Amino acid sequence: MKQPSLIYLTGFSGSGKSTIGPLLANSLGYDFVDLDQQIEHLAGKTINRIFTEEGEAHFRDLELMVLQNYSGKSELVVSLGGGLLQNDRCFSLIISTGTLVYLHSNPLVLAKRLSHKSDRPLMKGEDGQRLSRDAIEQKILNMLEQREPRYKTAQITVETDTKRIGTTVEELTRKIERYIRRCEKKQLERNTKQRKQ
């Protein structure tokens, strides 16, 4: 059953999911889980190592397994990996169980934010060498072209480019609370209609 208070945060790497997620959970009075951290804990290794040693297919299986642990919960904010929605099974599970929130950022802003993080696979080419800023921007644009259609299925979208984090969290809190109230009202109307039949 769909739980509007099960919040899935999505967005490209560098959009602010790991920073905003715990603050949003605190603002809503919910728990917080970073799915990538849970996968690393389960596997006993970093996501980079999982990809390198066991391949993407194994990582996607782990992703689904960990996601399923949280899909029946409520009052929970789950930070998703930037590419998770490309996993069809994960995408279907998310759409059917909770509320998807998209943290949108301009590709140039993402490139600037990510250029300071050397541990991200996105920052490296196939040869393992660090990419130039232009190459990072192009890589982001190419990946967004693939990911954006699923990001845009989110019930709630917030821009994270220029706002302060606190302002973004306040805006998200208002939008989520409003969305949950609308969902509850629709459910109440459906229940009332069914009882009358």
From Swiss-Prot:
Which cofactors are named for this entry? Mg(2+)
Q: A GO CC term? A: cytosol
Q: Which Pfam families match?
A: SKI
> How is the cofactor bound, as the UniProt entry phrases it?
Binds 1 Mg(2+) ion per subunit.
- Residue positions binding substrate: D36, R60, G82, R147
Query: Which positions in this protein are listed as binding ATP?
Result: G14, S15, G16, K17, S18, T19, R120
* Positions annotated to bind Mg(2+): S18
Q: Which UniProt keywords apply?
A: Amino-acid biosynthesis, Aromatic amino acid biosynthesis, ATP-binding, Cytoplasm, Kinase, Magnesium, Metal-binding, Nucleotide-binding, Transferase
> In which pathway does this enzyme or protein participate?
Metabolic intermediate biosynthesis; chorismate biosynthesis; chorismate from D-erythrose 4-phosphate and phosphoenolpyruvate: step 5/7
Q: Where in the cell is it found?
A: Cytoplasm
Q: What is its main location?
A: cytoplasm
**Listed PROSITE patterns:** SHIKIMATE_KINASE
Give any GO molecular function from the UniProt entry.
Answer: magnesium ion binding
EC main class here is transferase
What this protein catalyses is: shikimate + ATP = 3-phosphoshikimate + ADP + H(+)
Q: Which domain of life does the UniProt lineage start with?
A: Bacteria
User: Gene3D superfamilies recorded for this chain?
Assistant: P-loop containing nucleotide triphosphate hydrolases (3.40.50.300)
What EC number(s) are associated with this protein in UniProt?
2.7.1.71
One GO biological process this protein is involved in is: aromatic amino acid family biosynthetic process
What does the UniProt function comment say about this protein? Catalyzes the specific phosphorylation of the 3-hydroxyl group of shikimic acid using ATP as a cosubstrate.
**Belongs to which family?**
Belongs to the shikimate kinase family.
Q: How does it assemble?
A: Monomer.
List the protein's name.
Shikimate kinase
Q: Which organism is it from?
A: Prosthecochloris aestuarii (strain DSM 271 / SK 413)
- Its gene is aroK
